[in-house]
Amino acid sequence: EVGALLADWLLRRGVRGTYAASLVSGSLMHALATAHGVRTAETPTGFKWIVRAGTDADPLVYGYEEALGYAVAPDVVRDKDGISAALAVALLAAELKASGRTLTDRLDELAREHGLFATGQLSVRVEDLALIADAMARLRAAPPAALLGRPVEPADLAEADPPVDAVRLLGDRVRVIVRPSGTDPKLKAYLETVVP
């Protein structure tokens, strides 16, 4: 939620440009930026991709990923920067406190305005890495047609530009991304549903 709160804070301050997040991050930031008429970008995981998401017309002004990395001043630091992010959160919290509100209050307001974006992650650790490759191959060969009773469109992100070893299942108010961990012997599923 910190990623969305920081995006909201910048958007309300009139900061325009590209707002980027890794594909496994929640999509509330994209909804907020779209509501403000601002360009968004979805990138592979890692800040090397996020900091490249801007264009000449719409330079990157904010980026984050669910693994707790934030770029709130990418024109100054072209990487995740916990110091500037902590300062931005402190400024946001102070502004909210001055009006008798908290960060949680602002999240509640955003949920009422844009829907509740509920996210979670499941991980399966394995001893044999071949099990992960096999699971990804089976998912690509026979993706589910529905989740939570809602139809979903599968997308093999290995065919994206740049290619990503992941499968996305996207439907009305539901999104699942399955991918191997880049650091551990795990298969990860990133889950999101939006409650209007």
What are these regions (language model features)?
Residues E1-D8:
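Basic, amphipathic juxtamembrane/active-site segments
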